[in-house]
Amino acid sequence: EHWVLLGSNGAGKTTISRIAAARLFPSSGAVDVLGERMGRVDIAELHPRIGLCSSALAGQVLGGESVLSVVLSASYGRIGVWHEEYDDPDIERARALLEALGAGELVGRAWATLSSGERKRVEIARALMPDPELLILDEPASGLDVAGREQLLAALTEILSAPGSPSMVLVTHHLEEIPV
């Protein structure tokens, strides 16, 4: 299933997406994500089940981090590689995701050297890396020119139409950014 959160600035779309991604706890009430009750589940176990692409998360990446490390670290629900070890299948998956999103040539580049369009592609590859059950894309086309937006939406449409693709929540201001 795929959903869209469509609304104006300040409507709470990003707040809802952060709660759904288990990155923000609600101030009241109860929230279940992927069958798990927030506050009763180990967030470290829940994060790899949720792929998140958001400018807030991207802002936490260190500038010197390589594109490959940015994508790989999502396997553990972390930002940046620390002490984790990655094997060849992990590296192959990260490279394949970057390639599918038109960012294969960026593998060795540092995060700080990327344009906003390149960063968006890497962020989405990162969100898909753990093979999530739920994919949350918070304004994935923001900052892209028309051609870049169309390329990104085409890649997303292809990825999300594949068998076994994750459920998706897309946050946007624009109807034309909703993949078919």
Describe the role of every protein-language-model region.
Residues E85, A110-L114, E118:
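Conserved ABC ATPase signature
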Residues L72, D87-L106:
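Conserved ABC ATPase "signature" region
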Residues G29-G39, L46:
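Conserved ABC transporter NBD signature motif
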Residues I124:
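Hydrophobic anchor residue at the start of the ABC signature
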Residues L135-D138:
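Catalytic Walker B motif of ABC-type/P-loop ATPase nucleotide-binding domains
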Residues D131:
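Conserved catalytic motifs of ABC-family nucleotide-binding domains
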Residues A21:
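Helix-to-loop junction immediately C-terminal to a conserved catalytic motif
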